[in-house]
């Protein structure tokens, strides 16, 4: 039975049982690995068959690429199709990367600092200050990227349906040095908030003073539902298109909490124009790797 369906008495009984279970665990004096976000061995075992038999027989992707060899810049069709379904985007709106979406976020900001983004008048590093809006509580690794790169962080409070959009709309419309915002739009830690439809639409309709402002949409938990009765999140890329701001968002996710965290896939999704811009620079690195 779902907790939401339990009576007060049933919830109290469940609480008492869990507290006893917790006390029993404490009494054992265990030394446990409580690393945040690390799947248990039982969860990893669920993916073993996929790993053990992935190279049985045919090694080629649907477009004839030998998957034992060098891949392709934006991912094989099967990998792109997986993320197309997860995020509701088209094949030309995704780049499949390594196993870390956080690495792709870092690379995206580094590229913006050094080269700018699509439509930039100059690289972000040419401004006296670069600022990011940081809804809090948020993900400490997002904030660590800003801290490491000297990006000023501006805290934005949360409401029950997402970040304080009145504050966000005001700040981005007034300050050209605000170049981005971090967002965890679904099941955001530690509150579990999923952005409401209104919040997503207001993000898509932002009118930032900085023409190269970007929303960093870390949709890490887009398919991580606990029950059939789960939250739903509007498609930010589609909403940005409707609002006339198709290039304003970078969306990220990965399979880290789905299969093997160290051996999964990560992705950046964005408008075709944004993706083409990223590929035009990433292509240099790929050609260098193939030449080694």
What are these model-predicted stretches?
Residues 35, 157, 253:
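Residue-level detector of conserved, well-ordered beta-strand and adjacent loop positions
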Residues 59, 65-211, 222-244:
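Conserved core of the PLP fold type I
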Residues 218-219:
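Walker B catalytic acidic pair
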Residues 43-48, 226-230, 262-264:
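Short aromatic-enriched loop/helix-cap "lid" or pocket-rim segments at secondary-structure transitions
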Residues 97, 238-292:
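Conserved core segment of the aminotransferase class I/II
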Residues 2-74, 78, 84-85:
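N-terminal "arm"/small-domain region of PLP-dependent enzymes with the aminotransferase-like
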């Amino acid at each position: 039975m779902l907790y939401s369906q339990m009576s007060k008495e049933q919830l109290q009984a469940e609480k008492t049982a869990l507290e006893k279970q917790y006390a029993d665990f404490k009494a054992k004096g265990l030394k446990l690995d409580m690393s945040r976000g690390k799947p248990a061995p039982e969860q990893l075992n669920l993916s073993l068959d996929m790993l053990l038999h992935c190279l049985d027989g045919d090694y080629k992707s649907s477009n004839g690429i030998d998957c034992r060899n060098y891949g392709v810049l934006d991912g094989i069709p099967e990998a792109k199709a997986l993320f197309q379904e997860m995020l509701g985007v088209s094949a030309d709106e995704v780049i499949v990367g390594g196993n870390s979406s956080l690495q792709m976020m870092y690379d995206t900001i580094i590229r913006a600092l050094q080269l700018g983004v699509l439509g930039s008048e100059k690289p972000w590093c040419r401004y006296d200050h670069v600022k990011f809006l940081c809804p809090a509580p948020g993900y400490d690794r997002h904030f660590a990227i800003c801290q490491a790169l000297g990006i000023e962080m501006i805290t934005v409070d949360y409401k029950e349906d997402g970040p304080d959009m009145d504050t966000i709309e005001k700040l981005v419309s007034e300050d050209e040095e605000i170049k981005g915002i971090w967002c965890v739009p679904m099941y955001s830690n530690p509150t579990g908030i999923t952005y409401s439809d209104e919040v997503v639409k207001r993000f898509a309709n932002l009118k930032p003073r900085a023409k190269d402002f970007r929303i960093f949409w870390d949709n890490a938990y887009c398919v991580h539902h606990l029950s059939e009765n789960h939250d739903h999140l509007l498609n930010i890329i589609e909403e940005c298109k409707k609002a006339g701001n198709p290039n304003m968002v970078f969306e990220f996710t990965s399979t880290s909490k789905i299969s093997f965290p160290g051996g999964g896939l990560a992705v950046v999704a964005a408008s075709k124009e944004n993706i083409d811009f990223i590929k035009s620079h990433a292509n240099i690195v790929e050609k260098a790797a193939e030449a080694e």
